[in-house]
Amino acid sequence: MTTTGVPRAEFGVCGGSGTLSFAFPAGLEDDRVEVLAEDLFFDTPFGRSPSFTHFRVTGIHGTRDALAVKMHGWRRGVKRADASLQTFWVFHEAGVRKVLADGGVGSLNHLLDPRDVLVPTDFVDLTMKQDIYVRGDHLLIMRQPMCPDLHGHLFSSASERFARVFRRGSYLVTDGPRFETPAEVDYMKRLGADVIGQSLSPEVFLARDIGACFAGIYMVVNYGEGVVKEWEHKELKAIFFEEAADVARCVVDAIADADLDAGCGCMDMRKPSLLNLPQE
């Protein structure tokens, strides 16, 4: 059923493969979390939205509302770029100020092993999904792509739950859906990236486009081809099912603890556009 009005929410959650196997957020059975509505769909200028869950988190700053979408809003029959636009149009209508994301990634860095966690500070975008926007009326400066406040909360929570957590690193984004060849991995390593995945972009710049902060938490689920050793599907599957709850807890912790008015500087990275392009 399509819902007409988008509920207000301070936080948006782009759930990824890190929490795909988990009933987020209800499955946490966390006293801080109250699910307000599930299976919410909205009509957007980019098509019907994916399903959203509306929930509330009680933390040190009181209550915060959030809208969460599973697997970045991707589904069969919808282009990934359209799914992202639908998702972030809903976030914009809801008044979202902070966006959190999770996902599984492959290691490009020989020091990163499966089940390690990276809270990245930068990214390299090799996708074809860059010329998209919800508003498109601002210059999006990427000097500081990740919100330092959200980043700090994700890192702090992850450090309490996982054995090895890294607070600095670059995420290289590809279109997918296939995995990379050894030659491609070798090339990508030369670009200075530490992990590779398919979901940080366009989310990271669509968040800035709508005036929201962004940070993500990503678990290494496999080695890139030619890195350390060949990965095994059974290990990748085990990670998806065994680690999802703790990744979800990190996201909820960040919602509960983050300061909505932190002096993070993210909005200084967003300036009015100087290009007044004609509309078709």
How should each PLM-predicted stretch be described?
Residues 1-142:
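Metabolite-binding pocket within alpha/beta catalytic cores that recognizes anionic/polar moieties
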Residues 92-95, 189, 208:
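Non-catalytic positions within long, well-ordered alpha-helices that form the structural scaffold/packing
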Residues 97, 194, 213:
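Short acidic/polar active-site loop segments enriched in Thr and Asp
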Residues 149, 153-164, 249-257:
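Generic non-transmembrane alpha-helical segments
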Residues 158-194, 265-280:
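Active-site/ligand-binding-proximal alpha/beta "capping" segment
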Residues 198-235:
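Zn-dependent metallopeptidase/amidohydrolase metal-coordination segment
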Residues 225-278:
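His/Asp/Glu-rich mid-to-C-terminal helical/loop segments that flank catalytic regions of hydrolases
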